[in-house]
């Protein structure tokens, strides 16, 4: 756990203004949870960093939720399952976290 507190300020330096709304914190936590639930703290933080870096990149949406939920739709309105930036968002499974400890860890990193 000590490593988490040492690494977080370094990881999120320069991103303080990016995680402003509870909605963005929730979206980031969801992404960390679903992409890296079984990973180490470093792996979870890497997912957070990828997400935040995309927010800063002009090729991606400019919000955390926009990046996490970025996808393309067919003209019929159906999601193109191969276009999601993060696979968990388009896999058709429930996105509700089922592992409380992993969710709490993801939320801590996202905050």
Tell what function each PLM region has:
Residues 4-13:
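Sec-dependent N-terminal signal peptides
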Residues 15, 19-111:
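Bacterial extracytoplasmic/cell-wall-associated proteins, especially those involved in peptidoglycan
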